[in-house]
């Protein structure tokens, strides 16, 4: 039987077709280690809004409607929006967790990310027998897990989780863009672009900003200084 130790030495498979995208999941499942859950996050590098983590268990069969599935960063916003309900429809189980900016400031991004991944896995309606993540180790799980570098482009369940996380978070950032129109959050999704930091320097940070991030703190402090002069 293939064990976790066997897999720790394996690189992510070279992807050419959707069949290759399912290689890790199918092999683990055939050796009695399924069901296999994929986990990924969106918004870790952002300085505003939540970090969003999704977990997903996909059926071990080809799904024609998901032929376009790959790493969410390689898909257009329109394609992610198209795949989002289809993934929910065909997945055996899925979950989405949002960790707020306030919690990120309180606990740190690394802790928030790992905690969110554990929570997303625990929230699945189907208990996984094995968990595959996109490069990040997640301690404290009830089943074996394996981080795969480039997993969001190499493993179907991770790719599915990446789309769920990215699109779900984008919807939140679109809503925050309407709530705080001065910052253009619906465009840059909370990442530290020049226009975003200029807006923080001009208007100050919102409650949705991550004050523990140095770029937010510097821009917000500049706004405070100019405000008090």
Swiss-Prot record:
Protein name: Ribonuclease HII
SUPFAM superfamilies associated with the record: Ribonuclease H-like
Cofactor(s) needed: Mn(2+); Mg(2+)
Top-level division of the source organism's lineage: Bacteria
Location(s) in or outside the cell: Cytoplasm
Example GO BP: DNA replication, removal of RNA primer
Gene3D superfamilies reported in the protein's UniProt record: Ribonuclease H-like superfamily/Ribonuclease H
Nucleus found in the keyword field: no
Pfam families xrefs: RNase_HII (PF01351)
One Gene Ontology term of the molecular function aspect: RNA binding
Gene: rnhB
Residues at which a divalent metal cation binds: 40-41, 134
């Amino acid at each position: 039987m293939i064990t976790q130790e066997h897999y720790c030495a394996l690189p992510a498979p070279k992807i050419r077709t959707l069949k290759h995208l399912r290689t890790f999941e199918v092999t683990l499942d055939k050796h009695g280690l399924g069901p296999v859950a994929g986990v990924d996050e969106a918004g870790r590098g952002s300085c505003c809004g939540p970090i969003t983590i999704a977990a997903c268990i996909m059926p071990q069969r080809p799904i024609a409607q998901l032929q376009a599935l790959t790493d969410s960063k390689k898909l257009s916003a329109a394609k992610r929006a198209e795949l989002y309900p289809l993934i929910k429809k065909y997945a055996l189980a899925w979950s989405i967790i949002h960790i707020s900016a306030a919690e990120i400031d309180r606990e740190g991004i690394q802790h928030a990310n790992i905690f969110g991944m554990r929570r997303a896995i625990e929230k699945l309606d189907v208990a996984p027998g094995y968990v595959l993540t996109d490069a990040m180790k997640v301690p404290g799980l009830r089943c074996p897990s394996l981080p795969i570098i480039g997993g969001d482009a190499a493993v179907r369940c991770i790719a599915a989780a990446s789309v769920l996380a990215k699109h779900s978070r984008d919807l939140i950032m679109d809503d925050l863009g309407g709530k705080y129109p001065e910052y253009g959050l619906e465009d840059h999704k909370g990442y530290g672009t020049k226009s975003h930091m200029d807006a923080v320097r001009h208007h100050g940070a919102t409650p949705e900003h991550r004050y523990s991030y140095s770029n937010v703190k510097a821009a917000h402090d500049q706004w405070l200084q100019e405000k008090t002069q």
